Amino acid sequence: MESFFVFFTAAALPVVVAAAVIAGLCITAAWLARPRRVAEVFRRQGIDGPPPSSFLAGNLPEMKARVAAAASAAAPTADGEETASAGGGGGGRDFEKDGFDDYCTRIFPYFHKWRKAYGETYLYWLRRRPALYVTDPELIGEIGRCVSLDMGKPKYLQKGQEPLFGGGVLKANGACWARQRKVIAPEFYMARVRAMVQLMVDAAQPLIASWESRIDAAGGAAAAEVVVDGDLRSFSFDVISRACFGSDYSRGREIFLRLRELSGLMSETSVIFSIPSLRHLPTGKNRRIWRLTGEIRSLIMELVRERRCAARAAREHGGKAAPPSPPERDFLGSIIENSGGQPRPDDFVVDNCKNIYFAGHETSAVTATWCLMLLAAHPEWQDRARAEVLEVCGGDGAAAPAAPDFDMVSRMRTVGMVVQETLRLFPPSSFVVRETFRDMQLGRLLAPKGTYLFVPVSTMHHDVAAWGPTARLFDPSRFRDGVAAACKHPQASFMPFGLGARTCLGQNLALVEVKTLVAVVLARFEFTLSPEYRHSPAFRLIIEPEFGLRLRIRRAGGQDATSQVDTSTAPVHSSHN
C-alpha cells in the first residue's frame, strides 16, 4: 500500500506541477492582456486617450514630468511671485478686472493637455488600472445619480490615506459605508447645525480679540497686517472640537492639532504618485506618521473610556438620589452610543472622529480663507455684504450689532451668494473620484470593473460653456436665483461638496460656519489684500493658498475699541501666526 502511494505521488506530481504552471501562465496572460482588452472596450465607445508611457506605471511617468516642468516654470523670479492689486494690494494682477487664472492647468497640467487632445472624456492609466477623465455633463449626471453600492471610493485612496481616515465613513464602501452613514449623517442635519451657531460665535471671540490687539498695537486707526490662516484654522478647530467633544473640547483640540500635522505629512506626496510598498518601510517620515497615528488613537480612546465609564455609572445609579451627570450628547457621545453594533467598535469610534475632523474642519477653514481673500480683492462686495450683516444684526457702525443667530444667518442672502461664489472659484475638493467594483452601465457608457472615474470639480466650476464669459470673474450675483439658474447642467457644473450619494456629510456645518464667521468679521473689520500677498493656489489634499493669506485689517468705519459684536465671552487663545 505504501509503495502504491509513493508510486501514485511520483506519477501525479508532474501533472500537478504542470497544471499549476499552466494556471499561472493563464493568469499572467490575462493580467498582461487586460489593459489592451479594457482599452478596446472604451475605444468601441469612442473613447481614446494617451498611450501608457510605461508598461507597469501607465501614464504616471508623463504626469510626474509635466508636474515638474510646471513647477519649474512657476519658480520665483527676480521680480517675485504674482501679487494682487485689487482691493489695496500692490503691483500685480487686478482680480476685479482680469479674474483668476485657471490654476488647474498649473497644478494638473497633464489633464489640461490631454483634454485638448482627446476631448471631454478620455482614458489614461494609473499603473495597470484604467482611469476615465470625465467632463461630459451627461455622464457626470449619470455618476451622480448612481446609488449602487457597486460604485464607491477607490481602493488606492483607502490604502494610501489609511492613517488619516482609517475605515471611516468618508472612505468606506458598500454595506460598511451605508451602515456608518446611517449613524453619522444625522449629526450633520440642519436641525443639529442650527443649535451650533452660538458655539460658532463663541469660538470667533479669540480671533476678534487677536485682531483687535494687533490693530491697537498698530496705533488704533491704522491697519494691521495679519497672516490670517492660523486664526481661521484656530476658529475652525474650536468649532469642531466643541461640537465633537463638548466640554472636553480642549482635549479635542490636542487631537485635531495632531491630525493637522498628520495631514501635512500625508500631503507632501500625492497618493497617486507614491509607491504603495514604501509606506511600510521605517523611513523617518513613516515613523512620524506611525507615531502621530498612535498618539491620536490613544487620545481618542482615553476620552472614549471615560465616556463609557460615565455611561455605565449612570445606568448603575438608576433610582438612587443625586445620580451622576449623564454622558454628553455631542458627536463623540453619539458615535460611542452607536458603536455597539459595529464589527470593530473601537476602530469605528476612532476612525469616524478623524473623519469628522476632515468633514467639519478642513473645508470650513480653507473656504473661510478664500472667502476673505475674495472680499478683500473686491471691496464693493465687501461693503454690500457688511451692509447686509449690519441690517440683519441691527448695528449701525457706532452701536454694537447683535451676535448672529441661526435665523439671522439664514437671512443673509448676499453673504450666502459670496460663500457660494467662493466655493465655485475655489472648491475644497479638486476631484470627485469613484471606482466601479463590477462592470457598470452608466447611461451610454459601459465602464468595466476596476475603472477609476475622475470628475475634475475645479475645471467644471470654471467652464465657460456652463458659466458664461464671466466664469473666471468673482460675481456672487450669478447665484441670485439659486444654483439652478446660475449655470447650465447644475448637477455637473457645481459640486463643491461632491456628487450624488457620497456628497460630503459636513456641508451644512461648513456653510453655516463660514457664513457665521464672515458675518462676525464684517461687523467688526474692514480689510484689504496686503501688497505682500502672493496668489498661488496649491493642492494639499485640498486647494489652499500656498503662501498663506495676508490681509491689512482695520476696524470698520465709526467703531472704537469698545464697540464689539455683542457675544458671550470666550477664553482668548494666542495667535497661530
Curated annotation (Swiss-Prot):
Give the protein's cofactors: heme
Provide the transmembrane region boundaries. Answer: 4-24
Output the PROSITE patterns linked to this UniProt entry. Answer: CYTOCHROME_P450 (PS00086)
Q: Among the entry's GO cellular component annotations, what is one?
A: endoplasmic reticulum membrane
One GO biological process term is:
gibberellin catabolic process
Question: Which ranges does the record list as Lumenal topological domains?
Answer: 1-3
> What topology does the record note for this protein and the membrane?
Single-pass type III membrane protein
Q: EC no.? A: 1.14.-.-
Keywords, A to Z? Endoplasmic reticulum, Heme, Iron, Membrane, Metal-binding, Monooxygenase, Oxidoreductase, Signal-anchor, Transmembrane, Transmembrane helix
Q: Which GO terms describe its molecular function?
A: heme binding; iron ion binding; monooxygenase activity; oxidoreductase activity, acting on paired donors, with incorporation or reduction of molecular oxygen
Other comments on record: Overexpression of CYP714D1 causes severe dwarfism and sterility.
Q: What does this protein do?
A: Catalyzes the 16alpha,17-epoxidation on non-13-hydroxylated gibberellins (GAs), including GA4, GA9, and GA12. No activity with GA1, GA20, GA53 or ent-kaurenoic acid. Reduces the biological activity of GAs.
Tell me what this protein is called. Answer: Cytochrome P450 714D1
